[in-house]
Amino acid sequence: KADEAVKVASDAGQIVEKVLVWRRYPDAYQSEVPMKPGRDFFMDEYLPEFSGVRVDPVQLDADAALFLMYTSGTTGKPKGCQHSIGGYLTYVAGTSKYVQDIHPEDVYWCMADIGWITGHSYIVYGPLALAATSVMYEGVPTFPDAGRPWRIAERLGVNIFHTAPTTVRMLRKYGPEAPQKYNFEFKHMTTVGEPIEPEVWRWYYDVIGKGKAAIVDTWWQTETGGFLCSTMPAIHAMKPGSAGPAMPGIHPVIYDEDGNTVAEGSGIAGNICIQNPWPGGFQ
């Protein structure tokens, strides 16, 4: 796909000078697309040069760009969202600490794709800013079998777990036997990315959390940088299948299609709008 991506970029006026190619096994290049000398480089050949090397940080303005991430495109053409350094990092560190209860001594595992905003905010920047151990894995949760997540949790001593309802549903199909084979204990679990049905929530709580772990059901978007709505552990009561209230400092309102406020408790669907700025919002 690299040649296609380079052509698309070139047609848009962006010249790609170098392409880094990752080989799973050194000296084993299996793609049918030939490497282009001078443009394509095997990443594994250069990694040893930087192993153990300390890279001094570069001082930048708080409002300087940190990354550009595109939305999923589920509701239209993907849109590029640019996040800043200072505001974004402040928000994901704060929400990681107060919503997910992450501390330096914790071993935290978010099973999201690192290329998704959840992966950026809650695999990389949030937990690492708090000096916690952040687990990363490759592949899918059910290969070679459905016990894989729980083996990893047992082996690494994971005590905070973060995943999406789709993954919980998939693992639930295999029954409680797989997780019951392994010795792990989560103090806290997060659900993110979509609504979770009450019966799926209860399985997550009873089987994976063993009836002990606090669950936070979060709502947010690529554009928001971090959680906007969620219960707070030990403060709010958990409600199966329901995302929590607005985060501290976040003031949402529901509007109908004509811009009128939807009354609380009316049962009418509307559009969520946030009435105030917050540090994690995209630029």
Model-derived features: where do they sit?
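Gly/Ser/Thr-rich phosphate-binding loop
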Residues: 47, 132, 159-163, 172-240, ...
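Short Gly/Pro-enriched turn/cap motifs at secondary-structure boundaries
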Residues: 57-60, 237-246, 263
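Conserved pre-ATP/AMP-binding loop-to-beta segment of ANL
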Residues: 16-27, 35-70, 77, 87, ...
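Conserved S/T- and glycine-rich ATP-binding loop of Class I adenylate-forming
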Residues: 65, 71-74, 96, 108, ...
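Conserved AMP-binding/adenylation subdomain of ANL enzymes
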Residues: 89-107, 117-159, 173-176
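Conserved ATP/PPi-binding loop(s) of AMP-dependent carboxylate-activating enzymes
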Residues: 245-249, 260-283
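AMP-binding/adenylate-forming catalytic core of the ANL superfamily
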Residues: 2, 154, 161, 278-280
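Short beta-strand->loop structural element characteristic of the AMP-binding/adenylate-forming
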Residues: 1-5, 80-82, 133-141, 170, ...
